[in-house]
């Protein structure tokens, strides 16, 4: 009985420590995969890279990082659902971003300036590399 009461705090501590390790490790894996996909996409010469997208980074200052990632996901979905190019990469990028994004957001295309898909992906790559360096 004495051993069990001493063992419980140790087991709880180990559980907490490993959950923090796994969470940090997942962050590294997801970000690394996003950056790898962005590197592939931004080096491709493809007419889809010149498609117009809403400039989701031109959001108000109080927009959270999670909202920004959500907005990027919306634009990626709009592209890969309506065009047949780069579907595999854009779909995978969307799925990975979804794990870092808030669940709801909106992109008001009427009020936002436009950019190209290539510009959006280049800017996202810069943000993700910075985030990865802090992970």
Curated annotation (Swiss-Prot):
Q: Which residues form the signal peptide?
A: 1-24
- Matches recorded under SUPFAM superfamilies: 4-helical cytokines
Tell me the GO BP annotations in alphabetical order.
Answer: B cell activation; cell surface receptor signaling pathway via JAK-STAT; immune response; interleukin-4-mediated signaling pathway; macrophage activation; myeloid dendritic cell differentiation; negative regulation of apoptotic process; negative regulation of cellular response to transforming growth factor beta stimulus
Report a single Gene Ontology molecular function.
interleukin-4 receptor binding
Subcellular localization(s) per the UniProt record: Secreted
Sugar-modified residues:
62
UniProt keyword annotations, A-Z:
B-cell activation, Cytokine, Disulfide bond, Glycoprotein, Growth factor, Secreted, Signal
In the UniProt record, does the keyword Cell cycle occur?
Answer: no
What is its biological role? Participates in at least several B-cell activation processes as well as of other cell types. It is a costimulator of DNA-synthesis. It induces the expression of class II MHC molecules on resting B-cells. It enhances both secretion and cell surface expression of IgE and IgG1. It also regulates the expression of the low affinity Fc receptor for IgE (CD23) on both lymphocytes and monocytes. Positively regulates IL31RA expression in macrophages. Stimulates autophagy in dendritic cells by interfering with mTORC1 signaling and through the induction of RUFY4.
- Kindly provide the name given to this protein in its UniProt entry: Interleukin-4
The organism named in the record is: Bos taurus
Gene expressing this chain = IL4
């Amino acid at each position: 009985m004495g051993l069990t009461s001493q063992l419980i705090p140790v087991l709880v501590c180990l559980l907490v420590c490993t959950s923090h390790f796994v969470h940090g490790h997942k962050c590294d894996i997801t970000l690394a995969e996003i950056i790898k996909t962005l590197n592939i996409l931004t080096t491709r010469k493809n007419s889809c890279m010149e498609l117009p997208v809403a400039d989701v980074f031109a959001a108000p200052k109080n927009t959270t990082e999670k909202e920004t990632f959500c907005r990027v996901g919306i634009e990626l979905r709009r592209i890969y659902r309506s065009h047949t190019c780069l579907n595999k990469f854009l779909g995978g990028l969307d799925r990975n971003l979804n794990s870092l994004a808030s669940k709801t957001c909106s992109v008001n295309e009427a009020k936002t300036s436009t950019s190209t898909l290539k510009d959006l992906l280049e800017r996202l790559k810069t943000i993700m590399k910075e985030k990865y360096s802090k992970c």
